[in-house]
Amino acid sequence: MGSSDQATAHARAQAASARLFDDACAVIPGGVNSPVRAFTAVGGTPPFITAARGCRLTDADGNHYVDLVCSWGPMILGHAHPAVVEAVAKAAASGLSFGAPTPAESELAAEMIARVAPVERIRLVNSGTEATMSAVRLARGFTGRAKIVKFSGCYHGHVDALLADAGSGVATLGLPSSPGVTGATAADTIVLPYNDIDAVRQAFAEFGDQIAAVITEASPGNMGVVPPAPGFNAALRALTAEHGALLIVDEVMTGFRVSRSGWYGIDPVDADLFTFGKVMSGGLPAAAFGGRAEVMERLAPLGPVYQAGTLSGNPVAVAAGLATLRHADAAAYAALDANADRLARLLSDALTNAGVPHQIPRAGNMLSVFFTDTPVTDFASARATQTWRYPPFFHALLDAGVYPPCSAFETWFVSTALDDDAFDRIAAALPAAARAAAGADEGNS
């Protein structure tokens, strides 16, 4: 089906996905293994994806979509990139897991260290949540302090201490935190408004000798894209250093996506610890945390801070990550930036023509669509946007063969695989989607 055909085909087949969703709900809570996938924020039945190649997804009903989610960020080269598939197949043929060191683990760590100057040592783990959890534990062990400062709307995985006022699925579902997080755990977390350096100064004035670390997304993408104000991350570095606390920069989303060196390549602030995921795993379950040697060498077996994982450094995931990073060259990052520019222009033109108030903030090649005339600078202003316009906008795009993020608080991601046919489909779909947003009824939100 051509782009113009599917852009006007509003009777998208869904029977197979609906049946699969019912089956999933019978055995998996909510039918999904990560809450945002359930389409809670936009309604309807999530398509069940059966295949992907390049920038295109195929669902169980045979519908095809231009992918603007990219598995929530990792797929910078597109799906089933030949070099990544070949590397994974070769690694899998040699064995899936050994519970022992492998040469490729050190190669991946060295590749990451070469890209982010302050990182001198890397520890591989299995998820971004595990990376931030371990970084927080290490910061507490290194400083001998308990309190952690985080920011409203920043999401660092489902770590108990960091779920308070978080972004991503917590924002999508409208949850302030999560049942099961104890008061004692929450008491050691100080939550501050994002981009408010005066609030950080006040926190250090009150609790400075108790604060182990400040953790921040390098450039937040879990309340939508809300870049740091100029100098904000540098000011965090200065304040933490002044008070003997560590700075943890979460680059799980931005790392090796927005530049060869992640957000560090755009805003080079020398944090004590960084967390990574998504791109560095090539789409398989792997993540990492790293930083200066003095801190990292407090980890077991060299030091007393314990961290371990049966599948950490999994050879198949490491192979996918290495292949992705080695093919993410200057041309790839130029293509990502150009594709993000092109997508942002199409979005803005369509929404402007339909008279829809909007902001399209950027963090390198990451972007978001906020329905508002007012710049979004923190979680409060993100939540104040006209989110009720998003579900009809989303579904109009989905019905026309374009797959955007299924929440107003999530990031839009591009890949190098986006081609002219994909952009033609997006361009054909956007006018009707913009009109749907313009005609949205706040009372139905």
From Swiss-Prot:
One of its GO terms (molecular function) is pyridoxal phosphate binding. It holds the Pfam family Aminotran_3. Its main location: cytoplasm. One of its GO terms (cellular component) is cytoplasm. It catalyses: (S)-4-amino-5-oxopentanoate = 5-aminolevulinate. The modification N6-(pyridoxal phosphate)lysine is found at K278. PROSITE patterns: AA_TRANSFER_CLASS_3. It comes from the Bacteria. Keywords: Cytoplasm, Isomerase, Porphyrin biosynthesis, Pyridoxal phosphate. InterPro entries: 4pyrrol_synth_GluAld_NH2Trfase, Aminotrans_3, Aminotrans_3_PPA_site, PyrdxlP-dep_Trfase, PyrdxlP-dep_Trfase_major, PyrdxlP-dep_Trfase_small. Its EC number is 5.4.3.8. Its cofactor is pyridoxal 5'-phosphate. GO terms for biological process: protoporphyrinogen IX biosynthetic process. It is found in: Cytoplasm. Belongs to the class-III pyridoxal-phosphate-dependent aminotransferase family. HemL subfamily. NCBIfam families: hemL, PRK00062.1. This is Glutamate-1-semialdehyde 2,1-aminomutase. It comes from Mycobacterium avium (strain 104). The gene is hemL.
